[in-house]
Each structure stands twice: as structure tokens, then as C-alpha cells.
UniProtKB/Swiss-Prot annotation:
PANTHER family: PLANT UBX DOMAIN-CONTAINING PROTEIN 5-RELATED (PTHR23333:SF43), UBX DOMAIN CONTAINING PROTEIN (PTHR23333). Residues 211-222 have a biased composition (Polar residues). Residues 112-129, 231-242 have a biased composition (Basic and acidic residues). This is Plant UBX domain-containing protein 6. The lineage of its organism: Eukaryota, Viridiplantae, Streptophyta, Embryophyta, Tracheophyta. The gene is PUX6. CDD domains: UBX_UBXN2 (cd01770). Residues 357-434 form the UBX domain. Residues 49-62, 130-141, 312-323, 333-349 have a biased composition (Low complexity). The keyword Cell cycle does not apply. Residues 1-150, 208-265, 311-352 are annotated as: Disordered.
Length: 435
């Protein structure tokens, strides 16, 4: 065959073109493409096929013709956006990127292998810049918060509704008002108070009804209300901007009372206990017989001084050799009263007043106009007239124009002389003579 014939030349050109059109398939026996003999069998170095030069057909495959793309374009992209998700994934440990194909999540990118040079070629970190708002205005990283003015509102809850500051009464019949008070009671600041820093003071007066004369009395007064008139319950609610949560806790009412007691000095109360042979008396209280188990327990409990809740000073006067029917003066030696000294007198004759021991009896203490104290026994069927006769007998020279009052606040006069002690309810009571 003639090698210079046109058929031979055309055939040779077709073979060369076919070989040139074949893809550049790497040689599996090449040292550069052998599996990485590391301790990680599932990891291998990925070299894209686009990194190889095109086969020119002049000779067999030569590894020396392997060319790598320069890494500068990718480095430029990394420098432009080092915090992108792609760059974060590509920056692995070591100087080459290693993809794990065991999970089937390998990348199909045809980018060339990037060679990182440690500290020198590490992705460039952008300097921290001031953040920008949506209007392209520079915003400082440290915002200077302007001081907000604190608005204080006083919410007073009544049995028939509630008031805010000096506003009119808002009844609970209105669902909106009931919801407002429910939010306040749950220690949250309602939206109606505005997007500002708010302090709410809650005062509970649920035992009394709201009247127009009481409007504004709590908001302007700083004195706490009496304990017997209402339950003192105050809560501080601090509400910041765009927040309806409570930032400051509620102060317990018990803790508030303990704090007030610590701030105030203790008051020393003095009691005078007179012990008789058949019972005892405490100050000006009625006679207490030892036949009652509760009264006997009082004498055993008294020295502990735990009954009254405050530091006490108890002065005991022993009169065990006398009965309680005898007249005694209980003026204390430490008293600085300007009243005239009390005198001890003998009890009048009981011939005009007969006491039946078998009938129900009671002890009544009489405080006469001259400050003399007389304690005697009566039957419960005796009348007020009998008590007056007893006083008249003890003071034969005294005036009969006087009133008998039941000691109390205020004193109650006994105007019905024919009323019995039982019906008047003055058993074991203290009666005062007043002209």
C-alpha cells in the first residue's frame, strides 16, 4: 500500500482526529493517582479531570503533562466573602481540601485543588466595620441609649371595680376592665400603659366600695393605709420598651411587715397580774377563776412572755392570803398618773345582798367615781338595781344621782334598773360609776 496515497493520508488524519477527540483518561498506575495510604480508607484526594491538559496524540499518556489551575481566582473569591457557606466548607484541616465520600455528600465542583499555606494563605478576615441600616446609614456598634422617663401609675382595686390614678371608677361588669385588672394582678404591664418604662403601684381595697369622696386620696398620699381598713398589697412592676414581662419581683406582704417592724423600735408593754387565792386579774380585766382550765393554763404560760408577741414586762402581785371579794388597790408604783391615791376600804355588809352559792354566780368589778375599785360576786339573776344598792351601801354619804357604764369604747350606760345581769350580758365585766 502506498503510504503517500490520498486514501492512506485521509485514513491517518481520521485516526488522529479520533484520538484527539478521546477524553484525557488518567493512567490508573500513575503514582499521583494511587489511593492515599492514610489511616482513613474512606478519604481520598479529589483531582478534577478538567485540570489535565488535552491529549495531543503525539505520544502516549504522560503524567508530566499534568497541569493545575492557579488558585488565585478562588482565593480572590474567598477574600471577597470569607464567611460564605462554600468557603467555610472548603477550608479543611491541613493544606489540601479532603472530601468525605462515604456519606455520598461529595462535591461535583470542577474547581482545582487549592493549596493553603497555613497562616500565610489563610482566608483573609475582613476588619470589623460599622453595621449599616437599611437606609445605608452607618450605625455605631455601641448604641447610646437615651434615658427613658419613668411613668408611675397607681391602680386601686375596690370591691366593685378599680381606678387608675385619679380617673373615674371602672366597674368589673365591663369585660375590658376585668381583663385589664387580671393582667395587672398577674404582675404584667398591660399594653394600655404604652411602650414606655412604667412603674405600677397596686393597692387592694376589696373590703370596701368605691365612693367619689375617696377619689384621688391614695394617689396623692404616701402614708400607708390602716391595716384594719384594707389589705396592704403593693407590687412594683417595671416594664421596659417592647416588653410586657415583669422585670422586678413582687415584695411579699409578710416580708414588708417584717421590714417595717425592723425599722421601728419595739414598744414595751407592762402588764400587772394580781394573783388571788381563788383566781387572778390582769390589769383592769375581770376576775378570772382558777376553776376554768384556760385560766389555770394562763398562769403556767405567763412567765414565758410569749403570749403578746412583743417584749413584755409582767409585774406579779401576790394576794394569795385574800380572796377576790376583798377590796384591793391596783395602782402601780411606777405610775406617773396625777389621779388621787386610792384608798382601801372594807366591803359593805352583805346583809342587804344575798348571794346564793347554788345559783350561777359571777364577779363584777366596780370602779367608783373616787377611783376605788370594788370586786364582788353576784348571782346572774340580780338586777342593775341590786348593783346600785350595793354601791349606795358602800358610800352612804354619796350622791345617788349617777350612771353605771359598761367599760368599753364607747362606754354603754345601764339605764334599765330592772334588767338582770344575765340579760344585760355584764357577767365578769367592769362597771364604771359616773356623775
Amino acid at each position: 500500500m502506498d503510504v503517500n496515497s490520498p486514501e492512506t493520508t485521509e485514513k491517518h488524519l481520521n485516526e488522529v482526529s479520533a484520538d484527539a477527540a478521546k477524553p484525557n483518561v488518567p493512567n490508573p498506575n500513575d503514582e499521583l493517582l494511587r489511593r492515599n495510604p492514610s489511616s482513613f480508607p474512606n478519604l481520598r484526594i479529589k483531582i478534577p479531570t478538567s485540570s489535565f491538559s488535552t491529549f495531543d496524540g503525539s505520544s502516549g499518556y504522560s503524567p508530566s503533562r499534568l497541569q493545575l489551575r492557579p488558585p488565585w481566582p478562588s482565593l480572590k473569591r474567598a477574600a471577597a466573602n470569607p464567611f460564605s457557606r462554600q468557603n467555610k466548607r472548603r477550608q479543611g484541616a491541613g493544606n489540601v481540601r479532603i472530601d468525605d465520600f462515604s456519606g455520598g455528600t461529595g462535591s461535583d465542583s470542577d474547581e482545582a485543588v487549592e493549596h493553603y499555606g497555613g497562616e500565610e494563605n489563610r482566608a483573609i478576615e475582613r476588619p470589623e466595620q460599622s453595621s449599616r441600616s437599611m437606609s445605608e446609614e452607618t450605625v455605631s456598634s455601641e448604641l447610646e441609649e437615651e434615658p427613658q422617663k419613668v411613668f408611675t401609675h397607681t391602680v386601686t382595686s375596690w370591691s366593685n371595680g378599680f381606678t387608675v390614678d385619679d380617673s373615674s371608677l371602672k366597674t368589673l361588669d365591663d369585660p375590658e376592665n376585668a381583663t385589664f385588672l387580671e393582667i395587672i394582678s398577674s404582675m404584667e404591664s398591660p399594653r394600655e400603659l404604652g411602650q414606655v418604662r412604667v412603674q405600677v403601684k397596686i393597692i387592694s381595697r376589696e373590703e370596701e366600695n368605691y365612693t367619689e369622696s375617696q377619689a384621688g386620696s391614695d394617689s396623692a398620699s404616701t402614708k400607708p393605709p390602716p391595716a384594719l381598713a384594707m389589705r396592704a398589697k403593693e407590687s412594683a412592676i417595671e416594664r421596659s420598651e417592647q416588653s410586657s414581662k415583669v422585670l422586678s419581683g413582687e415584695t411579699d406582704s409578710a416580708e414588708l411587715q417584717e421590714q417595717q417592724q425592723e425599722d421601728q423600735p419595739y414598744e414595751v408593754v407592762t402588764y400587772t397580774v394580781t394573783i388571788w387565792r381563788n383566781g387572778f386579774t390582769v390589769d383592769d380585766d375581770p376576775f378570772k377563776s382558777l376553776d376554768d382550765p384556760e385560766n389555770a393554763a394562763f398562769l403556767e404560760y405567763m412567765p414565758e412572755d410569749n403570749k403578746f408577741g412583743v417584749p413584755t414586762t409582767t409585774r406579779s402581785t401576790s394576794c394569795s392570803s385574800q380572796t377576790h371579794q376583798e377590796l384591793q388597790t391596783l395602782a402601780g408604783s411606777e405610775s406617773t398618773s396625777t389621779e388621787p391615791p386610792l384608798t382601801t376600804t372594807q366591803p359593805p355588809s352583805m346583809s342587804s345582798l344575798v348571794v346564793d352559792p347554788a345559783a350561777p354566780t359571777t364577779s363584777i368589778q366596780l370602779i367608783l367615781a373616787d377611783s376605788t375599785r370594788i370586786v364582788t360576786q353576784f348571782n346572774t339573776h340580780h338586777t342593775i338595781r341590786d348593783i346600785r344598792c350595793f354601791i349606795d351601801t358602800s358610800r352612804p354619804d354619796g350622791s345617788k344621782d349617777y350612771q353605771l357604764l359598761i367599760m368599753g369604747s364607747p362606754p354603754t350606760p345601764l339605764s334599765d334598773f330592772d334588767q338582770t345581769i344575765e340579760k344585760a350580758g355584764i357577767a365578769n365585766s367592769v362597771l364604771v360609776q359616773k356623775f
